[in-house]
Amino acid sequence: MELNSIKPAAGASKNRKRIGRGTGSGHGKTATKGHKGQKARSGGSVKAGFEGGQMPMHRRLPKRGFKPLSKKVYSVVNLSQLDAFEQGSCVDVEAMQKSGLVKDICDGIKILASGELTKSLTIKAHKFSAAARDKITSVGGTVEEI
């Protein structure tokens, strides 16, 4: 094999469309823009959400509610998921990430009480629900807020 004989796989590369270069090219004269109208002009594009003068959808629908910018979003982990760890082990943020329980830590990790925990673990997280805290301590585990 030589460098001058290497070719890309079939269908891997496409020729770019050259427009406005004569009728023989198949894309001459109107350059694939059709005849007249706003979209045929230079800079002629309809702005996003424009519906031809009709009242646009985003103005027809009522305003509703409020989303606070300061609201914290926690990644949720249930007790049933934590039951996969070994007896007496320390479950912290790194351990949860390594085991694939948590992908993105938004503003922290919150432990919820869904499912059963059968092993005593030391769990370190940013938040705990009251029920989760009770279940962990009842099994003999410890809760540490980071």
From Swiss-Prot:
Signal peptide: none annotated. GO terms for molecular function: rRNA binding; structural constituent of ribosome. Pfam families: Ribosomal_L27A. GO terms for biological process: translation. Residues 30-39 have a biased composition (Basic residues). Residues 1-64 are annotated as: Disordered. GO terms for cellular component: cytosolic large ribosomal subunit. NCBIfam families: rplO_bact. Part of the 50S ribosomal subunit. Belongs to the universal ribosomal protein uL15 family. This is Large ribosomal subunit protein uL15.
